């Protein structure tokens, strides 16, 4: 079930302050965030965020196509190593 339209998108307050300060200063540093649940807003376009995946901060450069998605979608938390190989086919 999606979020109600009347509530608006969820963004942590500290995240708005950090993004506003970064865009005002003109510096292109990575903004470290832990809020994977926050929605990407139009004022974040062009900024680079370091989204924490439980192990490290994954750099995410925000583009126009990302607006409306969550930050956590772009920083995977699990490493996929592929499926295990079939032991029968290895012996041949």
Curated annotation (Swiss-Prot):
Keyword Flavoprotein part of the UniProt annotation: no
InterPro entries: Ribosomal_uS19 (IPR002222), Ribosomal_uS19_bac-type (IPR005732), Ribosomal_uS19_CS (IPR020934), Ribosomal_uS19_SF (IPR023575)
Alphabetical UniProt keywords: Ribonucleoprotein, Ribosomal protein, RNA-binding, rRNA-binding
GO biological process: ribosomal small subunit assembly; translation
Tree of life domain: Bacteria
Tagged with keyword RNA-binding: yes
GO cellular component, one term: small ribosomal subunit
Gene Ontology MF, one: rRNA binding
Family to which the UniProt record says this protein belongs: Belongs to the universal ribosomal protein uS19 family.
Role of this protein: Protein S19 forms a complex with S13 that binds strongly to the 16S ribosomal RNA.
Protein name (Swiss-Prot/TrEMBL): Small ribosomal subunit protein uS19
Organism: Xanthobacter autotrophicus (strain ATCC BAA-1158 / Py2)
Name of the gene encoding the protein in the UniProt record: rpsS
């Amino acid at each position: 079930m999606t979020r109600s339209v009347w509530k608006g998108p969820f963004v942590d307050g500290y995240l708005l302050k950090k993004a506003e300060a970064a865009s005002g200063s003109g510096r292109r540093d990575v903004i470290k965030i832990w809020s994977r649940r926050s929605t990407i807003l139009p004022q974040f376009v062009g900024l680079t965020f370091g989204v924490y995946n439980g192990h490290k901060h994954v750099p995410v450069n925000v583009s126009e196509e990302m607006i409306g998605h969550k930050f956590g979608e772009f920083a995977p938390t699990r490493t996929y190593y592929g499926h295990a190989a079939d032991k029968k086919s290895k012996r041949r």
